[in-house]
């Protein structure tokens, strides 16, 4: 049978062990949704959980739900559920704000404690959101800092000097797939007084 034929696809669908999973999602009829990297489709279970949170925990429980519904421990509870997916111990993972919000917080704090150092070093081909966040931190700090972009032809460690407060670097470049030797970069940055 031709693997590009409708018949082949239908035969494969009929024997797909995951075919029944489609019913777990709230998708409009006829929609094939393959763009789940940033916003997956809503599940029936998630919808019910949100409704319970809205109507019972928030609507009825009000502020008591921080304790009664254990909201206070959700960062640890959710982290423990994520831990096995990444091969970590449940006690070593915590759920927090988005990566972007956390990057803004940590970059702001790092720049603030690095008094006398005014440069953030990053790759020009770094994930765009990370660079936008660095630009936002600089604006927030009154334009007293500057962003130094490392070009592909340069080595990051060659850009480190006594004015570098922070090195902002993604372990794996999302465009090229290049993996940085973070231990070496961190060691070089720390030797020059910069944070990573």
Identify the function of each model-found stretch.
Residues 1-196:
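Pyridoxal 5′-phosphate
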């Amino acid at each position: 049978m031709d693997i590009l034929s409708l018949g082949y696809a239908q035969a494969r669908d009929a024997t797909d062990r995951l075919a029944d999973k489609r019913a777990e999602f709230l998708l409009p009829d006829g929609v094939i949704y393959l763009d789940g990297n940033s916003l997956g489709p809503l599940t029936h279970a998630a919808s019910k959980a949100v409704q319970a949170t809205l109507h019972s925990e928030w609507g009825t429980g009000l502020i008591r739900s921080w304790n009664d519904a254990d909201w206070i421990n959700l960062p640890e509870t959710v982290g423990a559920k994520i831990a096995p997916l990444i091969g970590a111990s449940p006690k070593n993972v915590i759920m927090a704000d988005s990566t972007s919000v956390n990057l803004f917080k940590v970059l702001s704090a790092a720049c603030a404690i690095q008094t006398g150092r005014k440069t953030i070093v990053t790759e020009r081909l770094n994930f765009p959101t990370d660079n936008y966040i660095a630009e936002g931190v600089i604006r927030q700090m009154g334009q007293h800092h500057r962003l130094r972009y490392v070009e592909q032809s340069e080595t990051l460690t060659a850009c480190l000097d006594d004015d570098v407060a922070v090195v902002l670097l993604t372990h794996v470049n999302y465009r090229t797939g290049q993996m940085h030797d973070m231990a070496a970069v961190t060691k070089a940055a720390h030797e020059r007084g910069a944070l990573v």
